[in-house]
Amino acid sequence: MLLCRLLFLECLIVIVDFYFDFLSPFSYLANHRLSKLAQDYGFSIRYYAIDLARVKIAIGNVGPSNRDLIVKLDYLKVDLQRWAELYEIPLVFPANYNSRRMNTGLYYSGAMAQTGAYVNVVFNAVWGDGIAPDLESLPALVSEKLGWDRSAFEDFISSDAATERYDEQTHAAIERKVFGVPTMFLGDEMWWGNDRLFMLENAVGGAPVNGE
């Protein structure tokens, strides 16, 4: 009887998979909104930090990035500020976009059962405060906020194990046909972009679909 009840409850759990790269301002916006939706609708978020450059190359997207297209970048900065104002959060561009080290840190936070907190802290530092993701002191700042052993965290993000896990998750994302960030999945349904979150909200509000 207890087993049946547990299986029934498991089927009611709604899980949204969230693929992101800390270099992405649109992922920062999406993370903020997705966290609010998770509170409102009671679903769980499964986080995946991936290498956006590798994902784009995998589908043949080898053109210049938005950062290299000055006219487009000028517009995107305006658009991003509009979204930030809508969400009532700050948005400050960092000095660079070298996100690999902090991306790998997600897989340390998983062992600490603090993935959501880690993602929020790093996004707020990089895009809320404009701190460069490769700033030498950023791991110490994150460790302090989360109550972690700084040395253990720094050792992990410099380890081969962290790189292997990061590469594995990026490859798995490519296999799942992820081509950009932010990308969200509810079951087999995929949405790409911060501006598609209203569609995800409609889906979450209408069906008890688990993410397995």
Curated annotation (Swiss-Prot):
GO terms for biological process: glutathione metabolic process; naphthalene catabolic process. InterPro entries: DSBA-like_thioredoxin_dom, GST_Kappa/NadH, HCCAis_GSTk, NahD-like, Thioredoxin-like_sf. It catalyses: 2-hydroxychromene-2-carboxylate = (3E)-4-(2-hydroxyphenyl)-2-oxobut-3-enoate. The keyword Isomerase applies. It holds the Pfam family DSBA. The active site is at S24. Substrate binds at K56, N66, R67, Y97. Keywords: Aromatic hydrocarbons catabolism, Isomerase, Plasmid. Its EC number is 5.99.1.4. GO terms for molecular function: 2-hydroxychromene-2-carboxylate isomerase activity; glutathione peroxidase activity; glutathione transferase activity. Pathway: Aromatic compound metabolism; naphthalene degradation. Its cofactor is glutathione. Glutathione binds at S24, V181, W192, G193, N194, D195. Involved in the naphthalene catabolic pathway. Catalyzes the reversible glutathione-dependent isomerization of 2-hydroxychromene-2-carboxylate (HCCA) to trans-O-hydroxybenzylidenepyruvate (THBPA). PANTHER family: GLUTATHIONE S-TRANSFERASE KAPPA, GLUTATHIONE S-TRANSFERASE KAPPA 1. DoxH and doxJ encode different enzymes that may have interchangeable functions. Encoded on an unnamed 75 kb plasmid. Belongs to the GST superfamily. NadH family. This is 2-hydroxychromene-2-carboxylate isomerase. It comes from Pseudomonas sp. (strain C18). The gene is doxJ.
